[in-house]
């Protein structure tokens, strides 16, 4: 891979890729899809930096952040990587895209786990993988 290809891929990751959320019980699609930016995108970098700042601000005088506080901030950070959410008729109801609604969706641990795993797996963002 050339330096130019590496830069081009990082820019391409800004467009995101589709993560189809599947049931944790039988692996079938839920009808919910998330468009998530790649780990090398500018958006992901900015979200990581913002998370570090937020963790520092949330720390007590001993430099500690509660488990609940840390989880909330990590969910907020992951939500910043989601460009779009679609929900088809099998999902039951339409999804109104907003940061707050994405955060609510990601509070479901098995959805958050899938989104986080997808966002961190560079194979999903390989050159030529745009979907």
Q: What are the language-model segments listed below?
A:
Residues 28-131:
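Short, surface-exposed, charged amphipathic helix/loop patches that serve as local interaction elements
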Residues 15-27:
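Short acidic-hydrophobic surface loop/beta-edge motif
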